[in-house]
Amino acid sequence: SKTMLLVEDNLELRFFLRSIFISNFNVIEAVNGAEGLDKALKFVPDIIISDIMMPEKDGITMTEDLRANMATSHIPVVLLTAKTDMDSKLEGMELGVEDYITKPFSATYLKARVENILTQRVKLQQLYCANLMNIQPVAEEEQQTQPEMSSHDRKFMEKLTELMEKNMDNGDLIVDDLVQELAVSRSVFFKKLKTLTGLAPIEFIKEMRVKRAAQLIESGDYNMTQIAYMVGINDPRYFSKCFKQRFGMTPTEYKENAKNKR
């Protein structure tokens, strides 16, 4: 199940929030922004709900710290506030806060907002997967309705894609090689990649390889054995199997299909 971090100094409100989400989430609690940041780094939750006004570190400062850290920059944050003033709202929105909810709020509304945010995340994963290797350019009007990715997350994905490009023909590439190059911990890498693309690292590597293979087949410049080696899958039968799993047809059928489309 998904993990939620609640950051709230008021015991009653924290208890109320916990009661709303405990049936659907593994709920972790923190009493101020400093503890919230520590727990976010330790548990890397799927979503954070935080108050703004808190001792030691307020919600806005905590969000700034979360956004500045590669390990937590992808986590959606919902801020709760008693303040209706526009300044803190704008400040929150500039940080890429997913939502801003003014107290008092209804449990139903908060629940619906959280569901909506996590659904948007899944859309972002699907979009990102479709666009790995730039296979399907996104239409401009579609782009405007897409959820935004933070600059940290974009950098992470760009660097990862670049590493895959460089190592495409390296059949010995393993997940640890990517982790080392990206200079993050293994657990952060797994969680971040899964959050951003919906794929586990091994699936991601395979996805990149077969998508590149599809591009090479479409180019018509190479035979299947050459293509298999170029994408680092040195066993032609295994190559055919991976390809069929992804595209629902063998590489040869895909080639025929591509020819007919021209």
Model-derived regions, located:
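Terminal helix-turn-helix DNA-binding modules in bacterial transcription factors
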Residues: 195-234, 257-262
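Charged docking surfaces used in two-component/phosphorelay signaling
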Residues: 15-19
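Acidic, metal-coordinating helix/loop segments flanking the phosphotransfer/catalytic sites
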Residues: 29-47
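Receiver (REC) domain active-site loop signature in two-component systems and cognate sites
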Residues: 54
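C-terminal output helix
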Residues: 105-114, 118, 126
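Basic/polar phosphate-binding segments, predominantly the helix-turn-helix DNA-binding elements
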Residues: 175-204, 230-250
